UniProtKB/Swiss-Prot annotation:
It catalyses: 2 pyruvate + H(+) = (2S)-2-acetolactate + CO2. GO terms for cellular component: acetolactate synthase complex; chloroplast. Residues 1-43 form a transit peptide. PANTHER family: ACETOLACTATE SYNTHASE CATALYTIC SUBUNIT, MITOCHONDRIAL (PTHR18968:SF13), THIAMINE PYROPHOSPHATE ENZYMES (PTHR18968). Thiamine diphosphate binds at residue 118. The keyword Plastid applies. The lineage of its organism: Eukaryota, Viridiplantae, Streptophyta, Embryophyta, Tracheophyta. Residues 461-541 are annotated as: Thiamine pyrophosphate binding. It is an enzyme of class 2 (transferase). It comes from Oryza sativa subsp. japonica. The gene is ALS1. This is Acetolactate synthase 1, chloroplastic. Residues 47-67 are annotated as: Disordered.
Length: 644
């Protein structure tokens, strides 16, 4: 991962031309597209990147030292980030991280995006990583700044998101003295990170950063935290860039390419099956092309988890869309009736399986995953392969193409059976006059963007409707807190995705409860003029909890109304007025007939925009398999207007 000094110097020199002269290193314009990992940029609206004026050359060099001259530890840290390919960080300053921010102002490469809360910046780093495949980097000060990262780190661990979080710490001599803003963040985050470091020697910084990025992005991706005391940041040293990583045990345990014999065994099971199903998760986010080719060669229908949305196109005839608690009837039917379950890049999460004993009870199970800890953890497979799913699919496809026999079994009867389920049990909802069904609003958004926008969500009913009613066509198009279920994720994640995909329309489909948790990040999308559209499905309630109250608690309301109890007829808080306070255009709609024109205007307006859509709180997300239930327990109708 380390580059030669000459190559690094050349890269930094080229990048410096683009960055030199930016004040405070914050972008105040829509950025021109640059190379990235992932799908090609798609513009869903009239928004076009604005090319900034050419900056004047600096009066003095940003870094007035030579390669062999000493510099502060904070500058070594920033140079190490540059050598790992970092161009964007999400950092909020404080006393213990000031040196890092000062060093960032001397970087010719890295831009800082100043979110207004550390949780917001960390969710933005997650959105950046999810939407690009690159490592997201966030920086916070010690104490409360560091602890504000906790939810985002836990979220990244559960959803396998590559992140590096860097925290300032009190000076080494003060550690353990309960100094001002001292928190043992390494201990706090030990169980919610893939690995973490406390740097006690300035000379370790190049190696530690190199290792942190390797750990975050290799194997099963995840978050890594690096805690750096302030005196280490201030200490002068000459960096040694050719230091090798010291991870012998970890590297030795990384999965190897799958054995041909195991892949042949999988294909034999495919050949023997009559009702196979592919169960695809977030572990396939880097192997969309290989997955589509495998499906083309075999004709096996595909269902995805919440994390797997987009890894196989939702509009493909062989797509069964999402399975699980709020998955389609036909996806859950297919898993229940299947004789072979190919589980690729999944972890048999409880929201997918329900009653684990009843899940795929008729099927032989093949589980391929890069994390050995997931194999057999929840459901025992008949065949297991611990490997990168991308390599496994490449191997399977090669074997299928080499075969002299017919590569595609005749699953036509199975296809017809599932097509009948699709016709009999489509996703649907009821309409009540001019009330706006939230599902309808998402369908209109899908139609007007042609299913090409990047979608971020908060957590709740709106999240499930966005999963059900938007058409995801490619990996990294869907961004949501799946494992942790962290409200407040949507807006900052959308902003991070926009940074990673300049000029591309990103829509945060949010609920009023989730949106309010990180509403302050409207400031960032306005200041940087990011084309982030916020579409709030506002029912004045904590909708998913209300749904459970309706179904399982005799509709007894227990602190789930989020409006003003003294005047329930008003919309409270007034998101339109709040957005305008951030200088963001905003509109509220209350009638179904207004929705299409309002969404069209939102998409056509350059820069950020907020659309507040008032929806009924009685709507339920359906289908629904109750927690711990099985396919036979699926609920297909009813809402909050019904007495149970």
């Amino acid at each position: 991962m380390a580059t030669t000094a000459a190559a690094a110097a050349a890269a930094l020199s080229a990048a410096a031309t683009a960055k030199t002269g930016r004040k405070n290193h914050q972008r105040h314009h829509v950025l021109p597209a640059r190379g990235r990992v992932g799908a090609a940029a798609v513009r869903c609206s009239a928004v076009s990147p604005v090319t900034p004026p050419s900056p004047a050359p600096p009066a003095t060099p940003l870094r007035p030292w030579g390669p062999a001259e000493p510099r502060k530890g904070a500058d070594i840290l920033v140079e190490a980030l540059e050598r790992c390919g970092v161009s964007d960080v999400f950092a909020y300053p404080g006393g213990a991280s000031m040196e890092i921010h000062q060093a960032l102002t001397r970087s010719p490469v890295i831009t800082n995006h100043l979110f207004r809360h550390e949780q917001g910046e960390a969710f933005a780093a997650s959105g950046y990583a999810r939407a690009s495949g690159r490592v997201g980097v966030c920086v916070a000060t010690s104490g409360p700044g560091a602890t504000n990262l906790v939810s985002a780190l836990a979220d990244a661990l559960l959803d396998s998101v590559p992140m590096v979080a860097i925290t300032g710490q009190v000076p080494r001599r003060m550690i353990g003295t309960d100094a001002f803003q001292e928190t043992p963040i390494v201990e706090v985050t030990r169980s919610i990170t893939k690995h973490n470091y406390l740097v006690l020697d300035v000379e370790d910084i190049p190696r530690v950063i190199q290792e942190a990025f390797f750990l975050a992005s290799s194997g099963r991706p995840g978050p890594v935290l690096v805690d750096i005391p302030k005196d280490i940041q201030q200490q002068m040293a000459v960096p040694v860039w050719d230091t090798s990583m010291n991870l012998p045990g970890y590297i030795a345990r990384l999965p190897k390419p799958p054995a041909t014999e195991l892949l042949e065994q999988v294909l034999r099971l495919v050949g023997e099956s009559r009702r196979p199903i592919l169960y695809v998760g977030g572990g396939c986010s880097a192997s969309g092309d290989e997955l589509r080719w495998f499906v083309e060669l075999t004709g096996i229908p595909v269902t995805t988890t919440l994390m797997g949305l987009g890894n196989f196109p939702s509009d493909d005839p062989l797509s069964l869309r999402m399975l699980g608690m709020h998955g389609t009837v036909y996806a859950n039917y297919a898993v229940d009736k299947a004789d072979l379950l190919l589980a690729f890049g999944v972890r048999f999460d409880d929201r997918v399986t329900g009653k684990i004993e009843a899940f795929a009870s008729r099927a032989k199970i093949v589980h391929i995953d890069i994390d050995p800890a997931e194999i057999g953890k929840n459901k025992q497979p008949h065949v297991s392969i611990c490997a990168d799913v991308k390599l496994a699919l490449q191997g399977l496809n090669a074997l299928l193409q080499q075969s002299t026999t017919k590569t595609s079994s005749d699953f036509s009867a199975w296809h017809n059976e599932l097509d009948q389920q699709k016709r009999e049990f489509p996703l649907g909802y009821k309409t009540f006059g001019e009330e706006i069904p939230p599902q309808y609003a998402i369908q209109v958004l899908d139609e007007l963007t042609k299913g090409e926008a990047i979608i971020a969500t908060g957590v709740g009913q709106h999240q499930m409707w966005a999963a059900q009613y938007y058409t995801y066509k490619r990996p990294r198009q869907w961004l949501s807190s799946a494992g942790l279920g962290a409200m407040g994720f949507g807006l900052p994640a959308a902003a991070g995705a926009s940074v990673a995909n300049p000029g591309v329309t990103v829509v945060d489909i949010d609920g009023d409860g989730s949106f309010l948790m990180n509403i302050q990040e409207l400031a960032l999308i306005r200041i940087e003029n990011l084309p982030v559209k916020v579409m709030v499905l506002n029912n004045q309630h904590l909708g998913m909890v209300v749904q459970w109250e309706d179904r399982f608690y005799k509709a007894n309301r227990a602190h789930t109304y989020l409006g003003n109890p003294e005047c329930e007829s008003e919309i409270y808080p007034d998101f339109v007025t709040i957005a305008k306070g951030f200088n963001i255009p905003a509109v509220r709609v209350t009638k179904k007939s207004e929705v299409r024109a309002a969404i069209k205007k939102m998409l056509e307006t350059p820069g950020p925009y907020l659309l507040d859509i008032i929806v009924p709180h009685q709507e339920h997300v359906l289908p629904m398999i109750p927690s711990g239930g099985a396919f036979k327990d699926m609920i297909l109708d009813g809402d909050g207007r019904t007495v149970y």
